Amino acid sequence: MDTIADVQSSVDKRNMPINQVGVKGLRLPLSIICAAGEQHTVADLTMTVALPAEQKGTHMSRFIELMLAQQGSMDFAALQRLTGDMLLKLQATAGRISIRFPFFRRKLAPVTGISSLLDYEVMLSGEILAGVYQHSLQVVIPVTSLCPCSKEISAYGAHNQRSHVTVTLISTEAVAIEEIIDLVELQGSCQLYGLLKRPDEKYVTEYAYDNPKFVEDMVRDVATALKADVRIQSFTVESENFESIHNHSAYALIQYP
């Protein structure tokens, strides 16, 4: 049998290294270990490695092979092992894996206690650079925000809206997804719920009215709570308020340190 040419392993003469090359948008079923146990989801993966200047291409099929051979659930330690395995399989010195997935949490309505699910967007990332591993967690948490100015100047009522608070953090050890959700939901004007009956709707309306927050208040309060956690080395907090009285959003961001 004739030998099949391995073009990607040939020499490239342009003397241009590539920071990240690999696969993006790879969708696979995955089990995530969380504080409540284990949750099955569908993940969207981006897997990349650094490519030296002299190598023409990476081995794209090896990324897929690595994930198809993956066994067990994903958590902080498993992602670190997987990132290391990727570098070995691709013969690379640096690489990154990002896993984005919907995360569901069961919540009880504040008055009736009716149970429902609420979804959150989560991304776990592991990166090895210069021999050092770094883990990051990103969670997008929807909350209600009610405008303090609108409340102050109005004879009755105040404009309120849904807000997305995005926390991206780098930690020295595992931080549970639920911990970040709890932390952020405590800082909103009110939490969101998948299902509410009339007594619950009355409660959340009045609760938000009693806890008005500007977008600036939101990011400052969340950042203050994150700074108190010794496991967290650095973080970014973003809040986007989808203004109910405008056709644009209010936005704020804090980076620490």
Kindly label every feature range from the protein language model.
Residues 1-257:
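N-terminal intrinsically disordered, cationic/polar leader segments
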